[in-house]
């Protein structure tokens, strides 16, 4: 019988394996990207209207943007990629879903720093974000498509799967093995959801994730860069003495 702790550690391989998978993933097929990228204005309008109807004015308890279904999906995702074990609490307990929700409800989610005037064409990886939906709408469209694909392939919603099956489904998303005619799901996962997960782990706790600085403590990061600038040279490659008590923005407010 395998050790549950060993299984949890193995599932943390997401932090290593998905980074390389995202870098080498081919572009989604044109018919998948076109539905979102704007080749069909009617499709984009329908997708956007559907997404807006599902989320507007009806956030799940404790969230600013997520609908109830989105909250259930994201909480299951972050708990799969960050399981509760001897290293950290679960992803939800660490505030990872809260961080993602806040990013989508704010300037980032609304495309505040993204050129959104078109024209909409399938771009190359080096050209960055090329879709006609703002990030929050792309997230919601992807969440619907991912959940539908999960139910089609497994007969269950993602949050109803076992931890092992959730892990396998997420890897299939990342590898481009799970597809949708309406949404480029590999791009959705690798370029939007997973980067937000990484940010949630290591951002300052003031933004909702990394609760109690748990990830900073885990890797020995001392906290606010400006506070430790003078120590970088002295402690380069060595454990920092105060890393067990890292400092965040709130500690100086």
Feature locations, PLM:
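Short, charge-rich amphipathic segments
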Residues: 15, 48, 74-76, 80
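Start-of-domain signal
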Residues: 63-65
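N-terminal secretory signal peptides and thylakoid transit peptides that target proteins
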Residues: 3-25, 29, 33
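Signal peptide processing junction and immediate N-terminal pro/mature segment
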Residues: 30-50
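Functionally constrained cores in energy, signaling, and assembly domains
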Residues: 20, 26-28, 82, 103, ...
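Short, contiguous pre-domain boundary segments
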Residues: 52-60
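Mature-region segments of soluble proteins
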Residues: 2-5, 58-59, 69-76, 87-253
């Amino acid at each position: 019988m395998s050790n549950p702790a060993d299984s949890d550690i193995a599932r943390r391989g997401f932090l290593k394996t998905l980074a390389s998978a995202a870098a080498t993933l081919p572009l989604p097929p044109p018919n998948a990207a076109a539905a979102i990228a704007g080749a069909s204005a009617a499709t984009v309008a329908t997708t956007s209207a559907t997404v807006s109807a599902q989320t507007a004015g009806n956030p799940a308890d404790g969230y600013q943007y997520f609908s109830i279904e989105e909250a259930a999906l994201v909480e299951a995702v972050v708990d799969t990629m960050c399981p509760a074990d001897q290293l950290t609490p679960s992803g939800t307990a660490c505030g990872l879903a809260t961080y993602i929700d806040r990013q989508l409800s704010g300037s980032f989610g609304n495309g505040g720093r993204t050129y959104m005037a078109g024209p909409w064409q399938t771009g190359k990886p080096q050209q960055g974000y090329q879709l006609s939906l703002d990030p929050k709408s792309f997230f919601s469209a992807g969440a619907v498509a991912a959940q539908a694909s999960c139910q089609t392939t497994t007969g269950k919603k993602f949050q109803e799967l076992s931890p092992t099956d959730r892990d396998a489904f997420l890897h299939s998303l990342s590898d481009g093995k799970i597809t949708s005619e309406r949404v480029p799901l590999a791009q959705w996962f690798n370029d939007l959801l997973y980067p937000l997960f990484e940010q949630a782990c290591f951002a300052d706790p003031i933004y909702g994730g990394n609760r109690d600085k748990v990830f900073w403590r885990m890797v020995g990061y001392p906290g606010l860069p400006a506070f430790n600038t003078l120590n970088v040279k002295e402690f380069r490659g060595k454990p920092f003495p105060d890393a067990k008590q890292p400092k965040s923005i709130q500690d100086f407010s």
